[in-house]
Regions:
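Conserved metal-phosphate-binding beta-hairpin within the catalytic cores
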Residues: 1-15, 136
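Long, contiguous binding/interaction regions
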Residues: 18-200
Length: 200
């Protein structure tokens, strides 16, 4: 350490790092405090019921540009069902929250049409502080409902949560979102009211 009238400079230091406790690692053996690389192993090529070919992969920061055209194909009602309120601002600051994620704490999978590269849907999962449970959210283009895309996205995020060792995942769904509630029942989720909000 060097010190003079202009300040203090540390030129040499020793840092000790204690071993992680058992279970303190995320999926694939990554320590939870590590900056995880892009998880390419989660990329999938899938086919919808109508034979549309879809590329499903983890989201990346540069996917922000895909959100504008995507939101143009989502009705106001579907936006309300996803965000629980009308959404008007789709600017950089808003969309960046969805595309710039820490893979050690969260995951989002984006579905793109293989032929055009256009965004078709997205599913997200954010783990709690203890990395034991997570909350999911999903949004699919309104003109693509009924083709099985939502089902594929949900299966992907469920498989990811299992691989990470999460014990439980849950989502908040408005009580009038009957399609989403029905899909969650089919996927094996337990459905119940939110004691703090009668609309959920």
């Amino acid at each position: 350490m060097l010190a003079d009238q202009s300040g203090v400079i540390v030129v040499d230091a020793r840092i000790s790092v204690a071993a992680l406790a058992p279970g303190a690692r995320g999926g694939r053996g990554h320590p939870r405090f590590a900056v995880r690389p892009y998880p390419q192993e989660w990329e999938r090529h899938l086919v919808l019921r109508d034979r549309m070919r879809v590329f499903l992969r983890p989201i990346r920061p540069e996917d922000e540009r895909l959100y504008g055209p995507f939101f143009e194909h989502v009705t106001e009602e579907d936006l309300r069902l996803r965000f629980f309120a009308p959404v008007k601002d789709f600017g950089h600051a808003y969309v960046a929250r969805f595309t710039q994620i820490d893979y050690a704490r969260a995951m989002a999978f984006i579905a793109m049409e293989t032929k055009t590269g256009s965004m078709l849907g997205v599913v997200r999962l954010h783990a709690d502080a203890n990395y034991e449970s997570g909350e999911f959210a999903i949004l699919v283009r309104s003109d693509l409902k009924g083709r099985g895309l939502g089902w594929l996205l949900m299966q992907q995020i469920i498989n990811y949560a299992r691989s990470e060792g999460l014990k439980r995942i849950e989502g908040q769904i408005l009580h009038d979102n009957s399609t989403m509630l029905a899909m969650c029942r089919e996927l094996g989720f337990a459905i119940g009211p939110d004691p703090n909000d009668p609309d959920i």
